[in-house]
């Protein structure tokens, strides 16, 4: 099992860029997901989870592997590293790196009278997480994140 304890690690610095810079997310084709429920929803939604970083004092390796399958790289991180990467104040001790995907509206299969949430260019990645949790709780059929610059 790989371990990273320094927030100065080049890999961790690249993840901070993913967290903070839309350009880094576009260039790498990846983004960060924070939280067990969010990782499960992304996995269920067909997102490819590449790596999971977790605090071993909060989660066991077995718990982490149950979230996104066994074909994922798992990295134990220190609390210092987690605090550097975490967006939310409340902590679950887990962050995933996932592949981005772009979907066309033509491929969206909706039933009759669908309930859709449309968000135009959310400023912070954490806002998207809140929108997704709200949409899930409200039983929405789709969430569309629109970027007027693309």
Per-region residue spans from a language model:
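RNA substrate-binding interface of SAM-dependent RNA methyltransferases
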Residues: 44, 108-150
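Acidic/glycine-rich phosphate/pyrophosphate-binding loops and surrounding catalytic core
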Residues: 89, 93-113, 145
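Boundary-proximal intrinsically disordered activation/regulatory segments immediately upstream
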Residues: 1-62, 149-150
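Structural motif
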Residues: 30, 50-52, 73-75, 92-96, ...
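A glycine-rich helix N-cap at a beta->alpha junction
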Residues: 69-87
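Residue-level signal for inorganic ion chemistry
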Residues: 35, 96, 135
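Short, aromatic/basic amphipathic alpha-helical patches
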Residues: 60-71
């Amino acid at each position: 099992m790989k371990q990273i304890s320094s927030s100065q690690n080049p890999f961790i610095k690249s993840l901070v860029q993913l967290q903070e810079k839309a350009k880094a997310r576009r260039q790498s084709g990846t983004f960060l997901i924070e939280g067990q429920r969010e990782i499960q929803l992304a996995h269920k939604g067909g997102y490819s989870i590449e790596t999971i970083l977790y605090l071993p004092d909060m989660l066991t390796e077995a718990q982490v592997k149950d979230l996104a399958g066994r074909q994922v790289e798992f990295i134990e991180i220190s609390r210092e590293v987690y605090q550097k990467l975490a967006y939310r104040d409340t902590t679950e001790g887990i962050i995933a790196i996932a592949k981005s995907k772009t979907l066309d509206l033509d491929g969206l299969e909706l039933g009759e009278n669908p309930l859709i949430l449309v968000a135009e260019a959310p400023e912070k990645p954490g806002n998207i997480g809140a929108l997704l949790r709200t949409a899930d709780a409200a039983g929405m059929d789709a969430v569309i994140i629109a970027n007027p610059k693309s």
